[in-house]
Regions:
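FAD/FMN-dependent oxidoreductases across multiple families
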Residues: 236-322
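N-terminal Rossmann-fold NAD(P) dinucleotide-binding loop
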Residues: 17-18
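Predominantly flavin-linked oxidoreductase catalytic cores and closely associated redox partners
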Residues: 109-258
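Glycine-rich FAD pyrophosphate-binding loop
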Residues: 25-45
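Hydrophobic anchor at the start of a short beta-strand
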Residues: 21, 29-31, 150
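Beta1/beta-strand and adjacent pyrophosphate-binding region of the FAD-binding site
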Residues: 2-14
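C-terminal helical "tail/cap" subdomain of flavin- and related membrane-associated enzymes
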Residues: 324-393
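A conserved beta-strand/loop capping segment in the N-terminal third of enzymes
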Residues: 52-105
Length: 393
């Protein structure tokens, strides 16, 4: 049995884990970043890197590589169940997730973090009800890794979160999705001009209820070769089957003529890959004695309201700042870590969060009626006053 000690151990080298490791290592903290897979590795995702995560990558010196590997989206075309359309301003990068995760893990290492890939964490070590490290399998050996703080960044439906009793599955909090890559998608060349001036499509349909379809050109050759990340995401695990989502996409593309035209010559170049995530209504406890929870494991996002990667990145920096504050105070208690984390992340009060959740449920329920998005998109296109009041400048 190998025993090692670090200031911070981070379980999971996805965006949240790697960004947290980079910030901590940059501040001089001894960080060990553990990842069960080997990079580069693929992961089902919409591949949209919005302003939030991009700002963190800029702060960590990683944005230039992202820029070179991405399509830059300038607008979104929204399409309703009846085929109503409007174009709205929306900016993000679109780079394949396997590239994003590679860039971020390499960035963490450049700043001084130690990365161990193909290292599977099998459990947490606790002493007097405080998390003090992890047990893992690495290169065929059982290892014991001790730390002052453990960051739990093992993704949605966190196995470590479940072992602590802080994450409980709630069907209405779950989102399930499928995505695949297509080539030769017929993009509107007046909107898709080059790598740095492109558009994406979001579709709302009776086929998804509370959810959406997307078509996003991705990577440096997305516009040139019509390479797009194509997918669907729906809310409420009990209402949908994973395998059914692909059928819904093909039915949608057949029902909306302009979408059908986009896929007349398109060829799928990857398998459909499925994924699940929890939204903020799951109510995951974010910290306890000796640990914090970040990224998808913390269930911090609301699809259609926030993007998951930016929420993950924000939580990563907040947890890094909280750890630094805890070390200065010599206090890694759950109460102190939670207070530091909340202050850094600017988490809303319970009252405000409850109101946000009510609005989220209202939005989701309204989307069961496709006429809601039909009318919304119609007004965005035809009513300048409505458009101005509902779109951020």
């Amino acid at each position: 049995m190998i025993i090692a000690e670090r200031d911070v151990i981070i379980v999971g080298a996805g965006p949240a884990g790697s960004i947290c490791a980079a910030y901590l290592a940059k501040a001089g903290v001894d960080v060990l970043l553990l990842e069960k897979d080997i990079f580069p590795r693929d992961k089902a995702c919409g591949d949209m890197e919005c302003e939030g995560i991009v700002s963190h990558m800029g702060a960590l010196g990683a944005v230039e590589e992202l820029d070179a590997l991405s399509t830059c989206i300038r607008n979104l075309k929204l399409i309703s169940n009846r085929g109503n359309e409007t174009l709205i301003p929306f900016e993000c990068y679109c780079a394949p997730r396997y590239e994003l995760d590679r860039i971020l893990s390499e960035t963490a290492v450049k700043h001084g973090a130690e990365l161990r890939q193909s290292c599977t964490v099998t459990g947490l070590i606790t002493e007097n009800d405080t998390v003090t490290g992890v047990r893992a399998k690495y290169k065929g050996e059982d290892v014991t890794l001790k730390s002052r703080i453990v960051m739990i960044a093992d993704g949605a439906f966190s196995s470590l979160g479940k072992s602590l009793g802080i994450a409980h599955e709630k069907p209405y909090s779950m989102w399930i999705g499928d995505r695949a890559y297509f080539k030769n998608v017929n993009l509107d060349r007046s909107l898709a001009k080059d790598q740095y001036n492109a558009y994406g499509v979001f579709g709302f349909s009776e086929l998804t209820g509370p959810g959406y379809f997307w078509v996003m050109p991705v990577g440096r050759d997305g516009v040139r070769d019509g390479i797009c990340n194509v997918g669907v995401m729906v809310n409420d695990l009990d209402a949908y089957r994973q395998a059914d989502l692909q059928e819904r996409f093909y039915k949608w593309s057949g029902n909306i003529p302009k979408i059908g035209e986009m896929f007349e010559r398109a060829v799928r170049i990857s398998p459909w890959e499925g994924g699940r995530m929890n939204d903020i209504s799951q109510g995951v406890q974010k910290a306890g004695d000796g640990y914090m929870v970040i990224g998808d494991a913390a269930a911090l996002t609301m699809p259609l309201v926030h993007d998951g990667l930016s929420a993950a990145a924000d939580s990563a920096k907040a947890a890094a700042l909280a750890a630094l504050g805890a070390f200065m105070a010599g206090d890694v208690s759950g109460e102190n870590l939670m207070n530091e984390y909340m202050r850094a992340y600017k988490m809303k009060s319970e009252r405000v969060t409850t109101e946000q959740l009510k609005l989220k449920r209202l939005l989701m329920e309204s989307m069961h009626d496709p006429s809601v998005m039909d009318k919304t998109i119609e007004l965005l296109e035809t009513d300048p006053i409505y458009r101005k009041s509902h779109l951020k400048r």
